Amino acid sequence: MQTIFVDMEPIMVQLLQGNAVAMTVEVQVKIETEGQDNAVFLTRQMPKISDAFVRDLYAFMPRMLKTKKRIDVLILKQRLQVVGERLMGRGLIKDILVQSKIGTPAG
C-alpha cells in the first residue's frame, strides 16, 4: 500500500497563566496513513481529529512545560498518536509528523 500524508490545519493552543494568555503555541501536523481510501476517510474526519487534538493539547501542554520546561516534539508526536488511535482506532493512523512548533509569548 502507498504511504500518504494528510495535512492538517495548524493547531493553535493558547497557554494561560492566571487569567491571561502567557504564550500561543502553533503546531503543524501531518498524519501518515496507508492507501487512498484511508487518506480520504481521515480527510473527512479531520474536524473531529483536529478538535480532539486541540482539546487534549490544551490540558497536556501546560503539564509538559511544567516538567520539561520546553515543548518536546517526540512526546508531542507520541501523545497525538495516542489521541488519534483512541478516536479512529488502531492501524488507521500510522504515524504523526510534527513539522514545526512555534511558541510566541503574549504581548
Where are these regions (language model features)?
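Flexible, low-complexity charged segments
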Residues: M1-G107
